[in-house]
Amino acid sequence: MASAMELSLLNPAMHHYGIAAKTASHLPVVPARRASSGAVRFRVRAAAAAPPAPAAKPGSPKKRGKTEVNESLLTPRFYTTDFDEMEQLFNAEINKQLNQDEFDALLQEFKTDYNQTHFIRNPEFKEAADKMQGPLRQIFVEFLERSCTAEFSGFLLYKELGRRLKKTNPVVAEIFSLMSRDEARHAGFLNKGLSDFNLALDLGFLTKARKYTFFKPKFIFYATYLSEKIGYWRYITIFRHLKANPEYQVYPIFKYFENWCQDENRHGDFFSALLKAQPQFLNDWKAKLWSRFFCLSVYITMYLNDCQRSAFYEGIGLNTKEFDMHVIYETNRTTARIFPAVPDVENPEFKRKLDRMVDINLKIISIGESNDLPLVKNLKRVPLIAQLVSEIIAAYLMPPIESGSVDFAEFEPKLVY
């Protein structure tokens, strides 16, 4: 699952908008414990190649260097849903709209496993990591951490859905299980990348300590469809850019993005089929409102998030805002084929609103980094948060584009290039 599942507009902490502190330094983290505030923290364990710790005093136990990393800094969150409702939705005896032939065709796509031998590393990885220094190295580690967490989040959700739907609809259940295979493969590949920087996410600990954000099934469908499709456009855009500009190929993981994005696209096609099988999620006024809401949630989150990390995109030769707008345009056009309404993102006013949100967000971040007392910081944030919310509401109220229908041309699972 791509990092677009970072739906911070739905996150009460709103850490993407500067209310949480910026990312801590990325040092090897060992113990996981509960902070005094009660927030669960998780660990990044040191890899074998980590720098040796200072020698311990004679007779004293050896300690490894550690720096805690707050869970909220490594998004997206982990999602759960109403599995009983899911079972009802995919029960062919209850839901006569299910097109099993369509799901059978998709299942064959997933069984083919086009990328079974794609994610194989070579010595270039470690060599490139050793050459990367300064701010780019730090922010690249954060990119790997966040991406690994996103993929692992998808793995856990898809795995559970595959398990729970096995009796109700074995075909749909198997597709979810095969998607969890893909997500696990992606997460493992990214975690191997962290080992090039002498780090590794402790995924076993994440499995035990994860927190869940509950989404109703229809919200899972909207959000995950967008997550997979926007992930496709992000990956293929970066791949094409670096293929045309190889001097910015700072790390070989990007060379894998062309095949990688095919997984994202197949996952999105499956969620498109799920939505078509539930026309009540697409054919009324509530569906139009929710479709616009989730589109905006994903687009705004990505734009603000990426603008906080421009050094990463500049490091690979991209203009952050131009890259994001291209991804938003393409994702919106793809989404319009299935969602009943989408935002008019090509209206120039939409980008102006996004840029104003970025400016407000930077001010909120600046307050968080100041030396003011916590109470003073909170008081200073209030009017800025109100401005940010106002801009988000104004973007939502812009005239939308009436779009897709469950009756559009017959679905054929295929890749977009």
Swiss-Prot record:
<keyword id="KW-0602">Photosynthesis</keyword>
<keyword id="KW-0472">Membrane</keyword>
<protein>
    <recommendedName>
        <fullName>Magnesium-protoporphyrin IX monomethyl ester [oxidative] cyclase, chloroplastic</fullName>
        <ecNumber>1.14.13.81</ecNumber>
    </recommendedName>
</protein>
<keyword id="KW-0150">Chloroplast</keyword>
<keyword id="KW-0521">NADP</keyword>
<dbReference type="GO" id="GO:0015979">
    <property type="term" value="P:photosynthesis"/>
</dbReference>
<dbReference type="Pfam" id="PF02915">
    <property type="entry name" value="Rubrerythrin"/>
</dbReference>
<dbReference type="GO" id="GO:0046872">
    <property type="term" value="F:metal ion binding"/>
</dbReference>
<keyword id="KW-0560">Oxidoreductase</keyword>
<dbReference type="InterPro" id="IPR008434">
    <property type="entry name" value="AcsF"/>
</dbReference>
<keyword id="KW-0149">Chlorophyll biosynthesis</keyword>
<comment type="function">
    <text>Catalyzes the formation of the isocyclic ring in chlorophyll biosynthesis. Mediates the cyclase reaction, which results in the formation of divinylprotochlorophyllide (Pchlide) characteristic of all chlorophylls from magnesium-protoporphyrin IX 13-monomethyl ester (MgPMME).</text>
</comment>
<keyword id="KW-0809">Transit peptide</keyword>
<dbReference type="GO" id="GO:0031969">
    <property type="term" value="C:chloroplast membrane"/>
</dbReference>
<keyword id="KW-0934">Plastid</keyword>
<dbReference type="GO" id="GO:0015995">
    <property type="term" value="P:chlorophyll biosynthetic process"/>
</dbReference>
<keyword id="KW-0408">Iron</keyword>
<feature type="transit peptide" description="Chloroplast">
    <location>
        <begin position="1"/>
        <end position="45"/>
    </location>
</feature>
<keyword id="KW-0479">Metal-binding</keyword>
<dbReference type="InterPro" id="IPR003251">
    <property type="entry name" value="Rr_diiron-bd_dom"/>
</dbReference>
<dbReference type="InterPro" id="IPR009078">
    <property type="entry name" value="Ferritin-like_SF"/>
</dbReference>
<dbReference type="GO" id="GO:0048529">
    <property type="term" value="F:magnesium-protoporphyrin IX monomethyl ester (oxidative) cyclase activity"/>
</dbReference>
<dbReference type="GO" id="GO:0009535">
    <property type="term" value="C:chloroplast thylakoid membrane"/>
</dbReference>
<comment type="pathway">
    <text>Porphyrin-containing compound metabolism; chlorophyll biosynthesis.</text>
</comment>
<comment type="similarity">
    <text>Belongs to the AcsF family.</text>
</comment>
